[in-house]
């Protein structure tokens, strides 16, 4: 009877630790996913280089058309 209680206690303890670790990991993933500041940074990283490339290609043509010095 004592060995049965001991093994059940061990299983309960290990299960509790496992659930605790899973909950912490899930909370960390939710924080990463729901963080609006991080999402804004990702959007900035994605769109600013594209905007700069388009401006670099179109900019000289626009300046040439405005100043008429080509």
UniProtKB/Swiss-Prot annotation:
It holds the Pfam family Antimicrobial_1. Residues 23-44 form a propeptide. Disulfide bonds join 64-70. GO terms for biological process: defense response to Gram-negative bacterium; defense response to Gram-positive bacterium. The keyword Disulfide bond applies. InterPro entries: Antimicrobial_frog_1, Frog_antimicrobial_propeptide. Keywords: Amphibian defense peptide, Antibiotic, Antimicrobial, Cleavage on pair of basic residues, Disulfide bond, Secreted, Signal. Residues 1-22 form the signal peptide. GO terms for cellular component: extracellular region. Its main location: secreted. It is found in: Secreted. Expressed by the skin glands. Belongs to the frog skin active peptide (FSAP) family. Brevinin subfamily. Antimicrobial peptide. This is Brevinin-1S. It comes from Odorrana schmackeri (Schmacker's frog).
């Amino acid at each position: 009877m004592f060995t049965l209680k001991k093994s059940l206690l061990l299983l309960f303890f290990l299960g509790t630790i496992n659930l605790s670790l899973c909950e912490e990991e899930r909370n960390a993933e939710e924080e990463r996913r729901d963080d609006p500041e991080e999402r804004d940074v990702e959007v900035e990283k994605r769109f600013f280089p594209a905007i700069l490339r388009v401006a670099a290609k179109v900019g000289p043509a626009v300046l040439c058309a405005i100043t008429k010095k080509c």
